[in-house]
Amino acid sequence: MRNLSNAELAKILDKDIFHLISQAADSLGLECYVVGGYVRDLFLERPSNDIDVVVVGSGIQVASALKQKLGRKAHLSVFRNFGTAQVKYRDIEVEFVGARKESYNHDSRKPIVEDGTLEDDQNRRDFTINALAVCLNSKRFGELVDPFDGVYDLEDGIVATPLDPDITFSDDPLRMMRCVRFATQLNFQIEDETYEALSRNADRLKIISGERIADEMNKIMLSPHPSCGFYYLKDTGLLQLIMPELCELDKVETRCGRSHKNNYDHTMEVLENVCCQTSNLWLRWAALLHDIGKPRSKRWDNQAGWTFRNHNVVGARMIPSMFRRMKLPMDAKMKYVQKLVELHMRPIVISDEEVTDSAVRRLLNDAGDDIDDLMTLCEADITSKNQVRKQHFLDNFRLVREKIADLKVRDYKRLFQPCIDGREIMEMFHLGSCPEVGALKQTLKDAVLDGKVANEREPLMELLMQKAKEHGLIE
């Protein structure tokens, strides 16, 4: 977080694009402000190329005037039904909208829009940190307008609504997901009144499309520490509406003095462990869902206590219906998550026993190109507080990885290194080390790699004799 004076803001905005916007607005006699995320990110020192501009008047007029100043290389898109316009120039995108005030019907998040002032426009913003505005008109260039002390909230690391949070969330329930997302992405706390309003209005999320919710879920998942967001979602009741199956993991049962671990907390640990290793969105989803089958497979055994046999298989079968309901992709991404969930116990079983070639080869066959991601998930799944037991598994996983690498090399040689080698060619044609031997050896290798000849002795020998004849080694 960086505290910026108006003079410092003016210096940061001392770029051609902002001066051209300023000139365009001044020529039309209209107030013009850069607003929202771009301003927020200036204070947070985060890069941003997407610029939102509010005009007190017609945003389309200012956008058109800017296009004229930028010339042919700029592209103008006008959306008259929404009163907005977009100008694209090189790697910069500027969105223009007229200042407006909004009101909502209870059963819709589509607002009733009227022309308004800058104050009206800032009142309708979702959070104080997104309600910041900086004037671009030449006489006030760089002047910050911050009626809700959003800069202080940025400094304190707080997400809060500008006005009554119950009205903010009831009017547009997607803002509840955005609230959790911003808190997670920025590692901020949610202000107390705002947090309580999330719980009170959670049921309003039902009017939001699955696609919009899925988009916010993916943004939370790609945050540095997504578990923070999932605890917010669970504790406010939002997660119960989105993924009730995940909430089931939070239940701990005790019988005969024996309890099982809290599988929700364990899942959050696994998710964080995976996030430390990769930004792969779908591997993160696999981490989130790897134990999703445990509640449905939980059984009590008088000897063993609580068991979750085949929870990986049960969980894998749940994935398609969950993805379909949440409007997540029903394609190779879903199958990837399903595969990792189903296979995530296999390396653990292998590592707990003798690490044999056959067991690892079967694992390689089933996991295919996703073997490294599977191993990352399995290593993340070791969350035992018993450090000796944890180290035992991690050491064995290292052996499994070494065996996988060794088998890949050996199997490659077995599959693609011709079964007739250079030494045999030399003996067959009574040759020493010479270019002809190298040429014949390369011919056989190319034929195998190109799939023209099976890596079997008889077809390779036939090809060898044909090429030897061409080289004059036999008649």
Q: Language model features by range: what are they?
A:
Residues M1-E475:
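Catalytic cores of the polymerase beta-like nucleotidyltransferase superfamily
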